[in-house]
Amino acid sequence: MQVLNSLRSAKARHPDCQIVRRKGRLYVICKTNPRFKAVQGRKKRK
């Protein structure tokens, strides 16, 4: 899964990609091609 600053280009990679909000984060999921998964807004580790 990629961590990206913006998911704007990530949602256009494949026609089946969807943007989903879970627990305050935005995810791109793609069931037909799972390598296109991405997340935006992850916590930084200290």
Swiss-Prot record:
Top-rank lineage group of the source organism: Bacteria
Spans traversing the lipid bilayer: none
Keywords of this entry: Ribonucleoprotein, Ribosomal protein
A cellular component term, taken from the record's GO annotations: ribonucleoprotein complex
The keyword Endoplasmic reticulum is assigned to this record: no
One record GO biological process: translation
Molecular-function annotations in GO: structural constituent of ribosome
Pfam family, one: Ribosomal_L36
Cited HAMAP family: Ribosomal_bL36
Similarity-based family: Belongs to the bacterial ribosomal protein bL36 family.
Protein name in the entry: Large ribosomal subunit protein bL36B
Organism, scientific name: Cronobacter sakazakii (strain ATCC BAA-894) (Enterobacter sakazakii)
